[in-house]
Each structure stands twice: as structure tokens, then as C-alpha cells.
Amino acid sequence: MRVRLTQIDGKLPNVALMKLAHHHRGDEVHFSKHVERDMLEPEYDRVYGSAIFEFSADRVARFRAAFPHAIVGGTFDRANPVTVEAVLNIEDSEAWDYSIYPGFDASIGFTQRGCRLKCGFCVVPKKEGKPRSVNTIASIWRGDPWPRHIHLLDNDFFGQPREQWKARIGEIKDGKFKVCWNQGVNIRTIDKDAAEALASVGCWDDGFKTRRLYTAWDNLGDEERFFSGVRLLEAAGIHPRNLLVYMLVGYDRRETWERIFYRFEKMTALEIRPYPMIFGNRERTLPLGGCNRRIAHRTLSEFQRWVIRKAYTFIPFEHYDVNAKGRADCSQLALAV
């Protein structure tokens, strides 16, 4: 059987596709990140595509047009997320094949599944249910000669029973693992023990080079709980400058530029690094609210780019040129205004 596995979006290796690669061992498996058929591509007996993000709808549509009989799954469709287990009619599987990602040398997996919270924009509670422990660090690591670098995809690490997360922390320390908490820890529910546990093992970016802890501040109403968590982490030894905070924008119907900049400026004042995550139409603007910036024409995608590129450190958003390639270009624009 000739099979095409297609990663439609996402930076990290796609776990669903690695599960399919494991299932199709012995078949002729082709992996691609191209959503359209190449000129010399063969015909396939089966085509799969996996997409994570809702904003990938255009790429999903192009993929389906190129491969009309493809099986497409993933969380991009929040109303009806399709899982590998449903497609293959199997129970939840933790077996996957890394061979489709030959340049990836870390290990990736979950110590727990599910989430205690029920955020309206998130598919995890519907898809995975209540928190439960599923793996040890040792079972996630691929073993020698692979580096002791772990990408943890847990959505609610501290939501599993306390004795379980403490055991995982012990494994990380004893095994001298470097861990990237890719999905973020829930800073709203963090306590002193959890903060100290994180500080004791260190937290790393996805390249395992820089100290970084991922978390989120999605709702303005969570301000007090968010900063309570920030203070607990700082007291434990994790400075705010080491936090990268996912910042949901465009979800709340009351969203305005004033509300967005309130969260943004509260974080940057503490050297926290925000990372906007856009809900819905990326090219729309918002009401100003009480914001006195001249940004009524700016879009959410432009704001996201301005923040991710850290252009806010040297040029106001209203003067930001989204086509500028680097700091020099932006600085020249600022001088010309």
C-alpha cells in the first residue's frame, strides 16, 4: 500500500501522523508538508492530512481539492475534531514512529491527558476528558543515543494526581532531563509546591537553549489569578522575563484594542514575553474602546507580527511596517514618520 502523510500546519512533529506512520509500517509511506500535489507525485492508495489550527482552513481546503479522497483530521475543526483512533477504529494509542522526522532528535509525548478547565475556545476537555496520568518520563524518552530532551504536550500537567506529577518531577531531576512544556502550564491554578517543582527542574524553549516557561493569559477577568501565579513563580526562582505567555485575542465579543493593550502592557512592564494567538478572522480590526492610539485600521495579524517579532521594543504599533524585514527597516520608518 502506498500512503501519503501530510502535515498541514504546525512546527513540531505531528503526533497523529507519527501514529499513522507506526500503523502503516511495512507500507510505502511518503511524508510531506505540501498541501498540493507535486508534478511527479505517484498515485496513493490512502492519503491522510492533519491540521491543528483553525487558521489553517485555507490550506485544508487546498489539500482537499488536491486529494479529494483524503482523510483529514486534527483539532482545526473545533466542532468535530477527528482523531487517529476514530479513523483506525482502535483504542487510544501511545505508539508512534519518529522515522518521518529524521532531523528531530528530541522525544515527545504526554504524561497526562485531559484538563480540569472548560474554556470555550479549547477542544481538549471534549476530546480528552478529565485529567488522568498516562506515561512516565522514562516511557516518553527514546533512550540512548537520543538526547535527554523532552517535549511535554500535557495540557494540564498539575491537573493529574499530586503524587503522579511529583513522581514525574522526580524523574526529570534524577534523569537530568531538559523539558519543554510546549502546551504551557496553567498559571491560574498553580500553587507554591508546583512553582517550586518547576523551578527545581528548569524549563526550556523548544530548542532547549533558553530558559523559558510557557503559560497563558487568555481572559482579562483572570488578571488577579494570572499575576498571583507570576508572583509564585518568581518567588520560586522563575523570573517573569523567562515566561512566554500565549495571549488569546479576538475571542471575547467585548474585545477592543484597549483591552488587548491593557493585557499586553501589563505583561511587558514585567519583561514577560507575550505571544498573541488569534481566534477567528486574522485580518479584522477591532473597536478602539478607550484606546487613543491611531490604530483603527490595523489588523489582528499585524498586531501578532509586531509582538512576535518584538518590534514593540523599538517602534510603536501605529508606525509598524508589516513588510519591514528587520529592525533596521522599522527604525528607518520610525525616523521618517
Which residue stretches match the model-derived regions?
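Short, charged, surface-exposed secondary-structure boundary motifs
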Residues: 47, 59-60, 79-86, 120, ...
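Core AdoMet radical
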Residues: 5-10, 46-52, 123-229, 240-250, ...
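Canonical Radical SAM [4Fe-4S] cluster-binding loop centered on the CxxxCxxC motif
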Residues: 15-19, 102-141
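A short, structured N-terminal alpha-helical element that caps or precedes a catalytic domain
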Residues: 1-69, 76-79
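A structural motif corresponding to the C-terminal lobe/cap of the Radical SAM core domain
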Residues: 204-212, 221-337
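Generic structural signal for well-ordered alpha-helices
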Residues: 60-67, 169-170, 195-202, 226-234, ...
